[in-house]
Amino acid sequence: MYGGDEYATNSEYYDDYAHTGDPQLDMEYERNYYAARMPDNVKYFLINFCQAIKEGNLYDIQNMYENTFPQISDHHFDKTAWPEEQEVAAIVDNDKVFLILYKELYYRHIHARIPGGPKLEQRINSFFNYCDFFNLIISAQNPVMLELPDIWLWELVDEFVYQFQNFAQYRARLTEKSQDEIQQLCVNHSNEWSILCILNVLHSLVDISNIKKQLEAISQGVDPQTVAGDFGKLSFYKMLGYFSLVGLLRVHSLLGDYYQAIKVLEPIEIHKKSAYSHIPACQISTSYYVGFAYMMMRRYADAIRTFSDILLYIQRTKQLYSTRSYQNDQINKQAEQMYHLLAICLVLHPQCIDESIQQVLREKNYHDAMFKMQCGDLEVFKSFFVFACPRFVSPCPPAVDAPMDDYVKDPMEHQLLVFMDEVRQQKDLPTTRSYLKLYTTLPLTKLASFIDPNASEDDVSKLLIRLLCFKHKMRNLVWSKGPSGLEGTFKSGSELDFYIDDDMIHIADTKVSHRYGDFFVRKILKFNDLNRKLKNINI
């Protein structure tokens, strides 16, 4: 992209006596000094990057952001930080906006690449840099004329939430800190990366962009520009507002508030494609957190639909992000987590899913684990949940006088406890279902003897409770239409239904027969495509 050499090894030492007292000459001296220390391709990249942002050249900005910056990072700064602000400021004429954006990338790189992670000072400085950026665009009387590619805006909001999550986990690890560090963290830096700051920023971006009104207008067939306002008319503010809704979904999910997580997305029709869902990483992240929230709310049918739809999308659009290794790794990991969550949901709430998703579950041996879960193996449920769940955080830091301990796992263990309590209530239901599927009528006493050959009258009474539990757990709230993901109608998700008359269970099989047409059409098309490729091979 840019040709250049490594850092000069024999750069002149910085000479305070070279300062003349003339601000212009001193700035020229600093520019030359820092430029001499910096590889040429890094220097040219920063100058061109700054110029592209000044001019609002989206094509060049996106190319440098997505391609050149990662390439230079790999070549020069694989496990080290990029040049500090003062070094960059000297060669970009102290451009305020560019320096804020550069520092966002600078601290993001430190979080991702530096062994051991960022220091406390770097975490705090990153927070204040985000404050500078958001104050610049939110507090302005008139819209800031800044053009950035949508992928950068998404990753900026996503990174903002990630660094909040990372700081909350760092703050909870008391065993790795001295008493002075704990005191400094809890007293001097109690407001930095606080949950109130994070929510305030995200809600402010949503409000200033009028994104909710715009989404409502679109759903009603009205031109969104009529309700967008001066700020929301600009793509920069509109997309930041949209991505902030997804950021709020993630924050509330990390806190374990699943109702509010779905609630903040009400203007977005979750199960429909929109013009705003053109960033694959954003769409995948949205579906992951929505599906997980549905699962924890015991809305398994909605969770299965959410996971199935996005996993099909990932299968069909891999080429969109496969060239970007960092995105590929992240998306592959999230896809693997969603397969684990889908397996859990299918065990707790069996239903038909797309054949291609079933094929992946078979190829990756999920069926063995699913069989163990159906047999009541709680350890498999636990391991799947721990692998696939978000890394939960506590909104509050540990108390200053709290015992020296690692509090990072407390939020996750609490969510695991809630989930496993639900699983324990359902672990006997697959056995009950398997017996009911064999009959159209079945006496209560006979079913009780199947479950326990030495069943007593008390066991028959307990069986009624189990059957009532089966009825209750198989009736879920299922979304059907409307912008709110919280709405829906109660439906039975089981492939069989029953009622009890005196001591007799009457069973009806409501299973819908498989439609094999789509499956064979896909296989025929795949075979024809393969046949064409074989014919084009020259032997």
From Swiss-Prot:
GO terms for biological process: formation of cytoplasmic translation initiation complex. Component of the eukaryotic translation initiation factor 3 (eIF-3) complex, which is involved in protein synthesis of a specialized repertoire of mRNAs and, together with other initiation factors, stimulates binding of mRNA and methionyl-tRNAi to the 40S ribosome. The eIF-3 complex specifically targets and initiates translation of a subset of mRNAs involved in cell proliferation. The keyword Amino-acid biosynthesis does not apply. This is Eukaryotic translation initiation factor 3 subunit L. The lineage of its organism: Eukaryota, Metazoa, Ecdysozoa, Arthropoda, Hexapoda. Belongs to the eIF-3 subunit L family. GO terms for molecular function: translation initiation factor activity. Residues 306-514 form the PCI domain. Its main location: cytoplasm. One of its GO terms (cellular component) is eukaryotic translation initiation factor 3 complex.
